[in-house]
């Protein structure tokens, strides 16, 4: 997996770019898991297909804010240009506004009034701290937190550890992060489980240690959000 260095941008300046043009349509998307180059390639293709299409991006550790403006030349109940944009990024879109992963996760847990426990090894507590930094009330839905070194060398070991943690905490859902730092990167492994199923995820990140941890954190949060959104999630 190739990971690109994030660009630096000022969110306030990006918002100002598209102001005071009432004849245009504006939208914002948050996407996860695509490289900066891939995102730009997709946006350039859209620019060739949609009238007056302009964009700005803010890319940071696998998460990208995309700000778009375009012109609908034909009035219609269905915004075909918006459909083209959404189709281009498909399952990578996790928000059509400024909501972060942490805010979405809090909203899903609070709406369902369900509990979560988080066991962090390789991410060193960054998942829990990010969740609580944005939503102090999330503490009401966290049953247990562990920040402790351990090693599961195989998927089977991680499944066993996950099921035990789920049983011990009595939570509706658990998240466990694991992995191993290697030369120039991180082999990241994590699990998400409810009472009916366990999902194991594996990723390889190439970057310095701190950046790898940030990407691992974002990856775990993204897949946790997807799991909580699933209609068949066993609540």
Predicted regions located by residue number:
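Hydrophobic structural packing positions in well-ordered secondary structure
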Residues: 1-2, 68, 220
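A generic structural signal for beta-strand entry/edge sites
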Residues: 26, 61-65, 183-187
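Short alpha-helical segments enriched in small residues
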Residues: 76-235
